[in-house]
Amino acid sequence: MADKSKSKQVYISVLALTMMNVSMVAGLANDVQQSFYGLASITYFAIGAICFFIPTALVAAELATGWSQRGGIFRWVGEGLGKGWALTCLLILWFETMLNFGIAMPSFTATVLFYTPNYDAAVKFAQNPQHEVLIMTGFIILYWFLTFLATKGVKAFANLAKYGVIIGSLIPLVVMIILAIVWVAQGHQPAIPISPKGLIPKWNCMGTLALAAGVFFSYTGIDMNAAHIKQLRHPEKEFPKAMFISVILAFLIFVIGTVIIAIIVPEKQINILYTLFTVFRVLGSTIGMPWLYMVLVWALLCNTIAMVVTNMAGPSFMLGQAGGSGFLPHWFQKKNKHKMPARLMYTQIAGMTIIAYLVKLIPNVEGFVVLLTQTITVLYLFYYVLMFTAFIKLRYDQPNRPRSFKVPGGKFGAWLVGGIGIISSIFCIVLAIYPPTQVKSEVGSPVVYVSVILILVAVVLGVCFVLYQLSKHHNWVDPNNKFAPFTWEIEGLKKPGKVTSNVPTTIMSKDQNPMGMPIKRPYKPDAQVSEDVIKKSETPSPSEN
């Protein structure tokens, strides 16, 4: 029987996790907004990578290799800052996904005709869309279907993500590079000056800072797939590898795609909705195939599918894992036969659907959308402040805990990387709260703008606090959950604190009762094991997964 259960263990490859990471962060459709800034966009992307993307990847890699049990961000923040903040991170992530997709959904309706060979009709429709509610309903049905697919298990949506990114981002990017070279070789003049001076951003006070913040935010999400770390055969080695490959691929998709768009389309002709399709048409025309844009548009849909299934699964998967430890009512904890929290996932897509219809049907809703978008930004970046803070604190609280990957430079390196991440996150939070120039027409006044955002943030954090307090007064623990206790619980502490133990978390969590139940095998805070034991622990057996 044991062998049979082991054979059912579902694993995903490094390639699959890498593509899942890339689908969360990068896509050619995201490049259009930055193409307004020409070659200077390279500088913005480089600054964003140095100040936020790389620190996030480095920190997530260390945390995942030191604390590779189920839970992702919940595990890491819980080890460093406690259960309350850990639950807050998961709920922020879950709400962020629901709100973000709900707000973005109505914009898809205007581009529906680009899936047909009539480019001119597609442009006219994008400029003056009709039957938007009906078309949006079609997209929402597609999203519900993709959520249904995501409930079929990690292996199913991992394959969707893998092939979706390859077909929908990497192959179109290669085609763009080749055809852009042909386009230039045919004697076409680039729409931007190609010189080192073009790399220097034009200073426009708050406008320049806001753009930088937008680039930082475009890099968020690479850590989300830590939810699936136990589906890797050797998570301590494979997770960092997937993270670093993801960083390189995402950066290349951002930079190369953005520069090609800026070269092909003059700044004044760039349209957020359909400029990417225009680029595909222009490039296709260089080889006598203007209809090529339609092929690439359908390919981009594959990337959208990858993004949706990964987003619909990741946050709910982590929340469902933690929920069984006593943090969610039993109804939300229930998993289907594929071990997916289907009820949580359908609740999330239902909320997204409601928001999408509200955004589309309520008149003069622009101000509401702006406020909701900025609230999401503030909450999501606060999530990263907590992650970076937990990382630094764990360097002091659990200095000897083995991590197969460690941010180099000792405590100085930890403060440098974590500090840059915290400062970048706070910088973006301040810019999100800072009233934009169009605030009067969209919201009313700067005071109302700032007040509403802060109130909405407080409401979400309040919901997190109330749910955590309720969990302490209700017996929501599932005794059959597979969520390991925090190390500080195993060591007999009431909350995270300083210990000198060097026992790997894989050893400490083995054969323990699940979180929320009495500790079965306690360890002392100063327990020590040999180097040989530590090395052996880096190759977990399937039963530990």
Report residues per predicted region:
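Helix-loop-helix connectors at the membrane interface of multi-pass transporters/channels
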Residues: 1-4, 75-78, 105-135, 171, ...
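TM-loop-TM module centered on a large, flexible mid-protein loop between adjacent transmembrane helices
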Residues: 75-77, 82, 114-119, 123-124, ...
